[in-house]
Amino acid sequence: MTTDATQTWIITGASKGFGRALAEAALAAGDNVVVAVRNPDGMADLAAEYSDTCLVARFDARDTHAAAGLVSATLDRFGRLDVLVNNAGRAVIGAVEEVSDAQLRDLMDLHLFGPAALVRAALPAMRGRRSGTIVQMSSQGGRVAFPGVSAYCASKFALEGWSESLAAEVAPFGVRVLLVEPSRFRTAFNAGLEFSAVSDSYRDTLAPLRADMAGADGVQEGDPVRAAGIIVRLAHSEHVPLRLPLGSEAVERLSGVYRRGLAEVERWAEIARSADFDDAVSAVRPV
């Protein structure tokens, strides 16, 4: 799907960081953008600069009941929906024993259930046109988990698994799915981290992580403007990858994860295969 034609985007969490950079890049490219944010007042400058092509919508990405209304507003204003970006996100820092059930569920609402509802609302329009791109802003933490960020990684792992199934289901309708897996980028993400209550058991073991996460704000390697430009170009291109590690750290770290994972499978393959019935016939599956 190579196209220079005007596309219409929905971008959640577009008030800052990746979302803001994406909105600015898409608008600068001549596209229409619906910026879905909790505080529309903060988007007045963008709405004024792009009054014909930018629609600001009040939206909480965790509110699954609001998804259909956001898509309807987009179609009413621009007549089509080409690109959906589930970008809204945040993180909770703390050991498994320190993070509460409420904190874990809130991240699942934000990173899985909210995006799932918005995708379901958007798909009829995309399927109807047999065209569309769904961009899921994941993380390198959606492929490799780190101590102290279990809740965040769990929610991103869930998003990735759900999205991989989605990609196979919607491909026959001309709809693509792109999972973006950034490393650290110079956004306000780290400034907005939520830290769980610190227990004596993990105070020392996770102290370096907490300090690193808190101290990284403003010195991250990744440039969100460059990243946004890449995503906009991909949305207009013929081919997109299912997964795009974004940033040098993500490329290096995830390459190592895949190499070590394959080596581990091969190391234990003989034992693993011995669990089958001796006379079992290998299954033939549709996928």
Where are these regions (language model features)?
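Residue(s) in the substrate-gating loop at a strand-loop-helix junction
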Residues: 139
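SDR active-site lid
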Residues: 172-241
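Conserved glycine-rich Rossmann-like NAD(P)H-binding loop of the short-chain dehydrogenase/reductase
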Residues: 29-45
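The beta1-alpha1 cofactor-binding region of Rossmann-like NAD(H)/NADP(H)-dependent oxidoreductases
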Residues: 59-69, 101
